[in-house]
Amino acid sequence: MNKSHLGTADNPQEVVTAHDIGRLVDVVNVGKGFLRYVGPIHGKDGMFCGIELLEPNGKHDGTFQGVSYFIATPYHGIFAPIFRVTLDAEELPKPPPPNPSNRLSRSALPALQLRNPLTQERKPEEDVMSTSVYVSSSTKPIAIPTKQCRPPETDPMQMSMFSDMMDGSMFSNGSWSDIADSMITSNCTFTVRKGLPIDDDGDLMSVPMVQSVFNIDREALRREEQLQSSIVLGESRIGVEHLPIIEDENELETPLVETRTMPLPNDLNANFSNKNSTTTFVEPETPKVEIRENGNLDNSIETPPQQSPSGSSMVSHESDSSSKKDDTKSDKSPTKKSQKMEEKPVVKKKEEPAAPPPPPKFPVKQKAPSKHQLMMEQLKASIEAEKTKPKKEIKSRVSLLPPPAPKAPQKENKEGGEMTETPRRTITKTPLKTVNAKAKTSPTPPVERQKKERKPLYVAPPAKERVEKEKKIPSKPVVSPPTTAEKKPVVSSIPSTSSASKGPFPTSSFAGGKLQGPRKTSSSSTTTSAKKQKNPPIDEKEKLSRLQHSTHAFEATLIVMNRINEDNERKLGNISEQYEKKVSELGDLKKMLDEARKKFEEDVEQMKNSNQQVIRNHANAVESLQKTHETQIAEKNKEFERNFEEERARREAEVCAMNNRHQKVVACLDEKISEAEKQCEQLNVDKKVLQAALANDCDHRNQMLTKEISSLQTALEMKSAEMKELRQKNQNLSLQVDEIPLKELEISKWKHKSNEYKQMLDQKINGEKILVQQIEDLRRKQIHDEEEKEAMKRSFDLMQFKYENGDDPNVTSVMSAPMESRFSTPTKVQFRSRSSASGSRPISMATSNGGDQRLSTSSHHDDSMNRSTISMYTSHIRLPENHADDVIYAPDEIISSRSGSISQRLAISIENDGEPTIKSESSRIGNTSDSGIGLVM
């Protein structure tokens, strides 16, 4: 695709962009306010404007869904779509003068008519304050309202169009959802200018891209790239050979899409079309309209090459010719610009036939037909079928009857003359799908009957009937020719009346339904076959009946035509009334324009007078200022000369003083220079002496340096040897230092062991002391026991002597008892519990005397340790070495307890030899202590 290298046209109404932030804007049905934000909103599609309203009619303070887009007073902020916001009329800047070299841009494909705001209904209030400029061959008015009454719907930016310099925040408001339902041509092509105008030769790529300050994103850049190039929606519907070529001779031509005319609308649609001020027609011509900055509306109209007129095309040509006459009348009247209140004449170019388009300059590639092409072919086939209807045959058959009224205007139209104005009528558009569907589902053509001889039809009817018919024809005035849409129901109504009265009409052309091309051929073949056959004779009655049928059919056509004429008269009256209203409105507007001109001229005169007065005042002021300036300059010159003389005298005195000081300084410097020369001579002599001394000193030093170096080397070797020894010692010491923690651990271990051994030694010493005391006690006890034993022996001897003598009976009874029974009790060692250990032992019969009591009382206060020690020693002395049955591991309670007496644990058994034997647990404990158990006190 080739990019457009055209400039940009002017927009009569400024579109709000991010560059207009802070300006006063007007929101539709809301009010005025200041623009604060332009850009997208989170959660919403499209571009929105944030406005701070002057009145508290808003809904928020600039925050929407938690996101703050701008700051405003509460209930003064509102978000509105960008197409509903327009700059206030007072804020609109004055446009620069128009560039006469602007060219129109156009699309390579037929534009799709969307919801065009120019075709919307407009209120009568707006029609009063605005003038409608009708473009030639078009019935859609382009309204140019006056100041402060322009509705936002008339903004050309709302149409489906794009510009190379369009800002990223501007979008068209067209709907692309009904593309198939609105396949018609576009009557106007606009080029929107946004920014500064450029030269014709300038390239658009060199123009800086207009970007928003607050809305810079990748999406905007991507959209601008799309806007800068032409976009083809789908494939071409008209063929590659018919596409226009850039920089071609017929550059302003636009290919057309042929449409099918719809049937005649009913009365309701007709009335509705009369009420609506804006009507829509499908037109074969596509004029280009350029709206410049100064408000002039230039209409350049070029008609593409037309084919042979058909039934449908004739209707459009007739309606176009009638609309052209109205447009020429309306275009001659002056119109008003909405912004400047100035008269902007509408220049209309004469309609000139366009030259046929040249052949394509590029090779046409054969492609497989697409769906759109097939649809277009079907549509063209249906149109060709309508063109090939047998119209001549119908005219020849009806020519016998009086000519109908609508014939004359058609001939005038064919000859090129003008016709009366016909009312505009809205024709409902149907998509191609429905047209094709109707073409496919059209009723089957009726079976052709054999035509009979038409010779009796040439017989003239009676004179009375012909006079009546001739009188009925001129009774209705001819107003306007009927369109093909109006003719079709007439043709279809004729067979209905004839069939209701009697049999079908002999001619097949009056049958119901639409005639197509194949029917013509079939009818011609049937007529030829009928001529070849033999025609039977026809009776007079049948002739009269046929003539009556034809007269009835003609009367029906006359009735229909009369009704149509009445409707046309009524429509013409309405149109004339509307025209009168428009003329009155135009007169009012002219009066207003004259008043405005007068007011403007008065203002201009007043401004001229005030300007002249200001000029005179300015000249007087300049002269007075010049005089005062000259006087001030003279005074300043005198003062400057006086100051200059004073300054010159002062400077001369200073120069003299400086010369005197300079001479004195020169004399001093001469003396110093002479002294410095003498010092230089003396220094040169000293230098020579010092150089000689330095040479001698250097030789002596060089000789001494070798000796010093050798001595230093020997000292270095000695130091290195000492360093080696010290390093070895350091290594040994480091090893010893590493062994210190191990030695400390061993020392701590040995200290712990020594403490343990000391404790054990102390325990043993204490045990020995205790044992020595126990031994001494035992010796004393042994001595005491021996003494008691001797005493007992003596007493026993005495008792035995007495027994032998038989002096005492008690003694004899005792002695008479056996020896075993006497000493059986003390021979047993009794082990008692802890509770019984504290108590005293019962006295035996053998110890009933005082010695036994004394023994028991003396031994009652001894310790259990003493008892165990005695048992240990006694067992060690008395018992044999292999005797281990008596070893008992006594519990700690026996060792630690100090209560009780030995008498409670010991029992003395007197054996035959008379030596006591101790049998107790202590003996076993003693053996265990000797075997290695240490005593802990």
From Swiss-Prot:
Residue ranges of every copy of the CAP-Gly domain listed in the record: 39-81
Region (Disordered): 90-131, 264-548, 819-866, 916-937
InterPro entries associated with the record: CAP-Gly_dom_sf, CAP-Gly_domain
GO cellular component, one term: nuclear envelope
GO MF annotations in UniProt: microtubule binding
Biased composition (Low complexity): 492-501, 832-844
Coiled coil spans: 566-740, 773-800
Compositional bias ranges of the Polar residues kind: 268-281, 296-309, 845-858
GO BP annotations listed: nucleus localization; nucleus organization
Bias (Basic and acidic residues) ranges: 285-295, 317-353, 383-396, 409-424, 463-473
Protein's name according to its UniProt entry: CAP-Gly domain-containing linker protein 1 homolog
Organism (species): Caenorhabditis elegans
Encoding gene, per UniProt annotation: clip-1
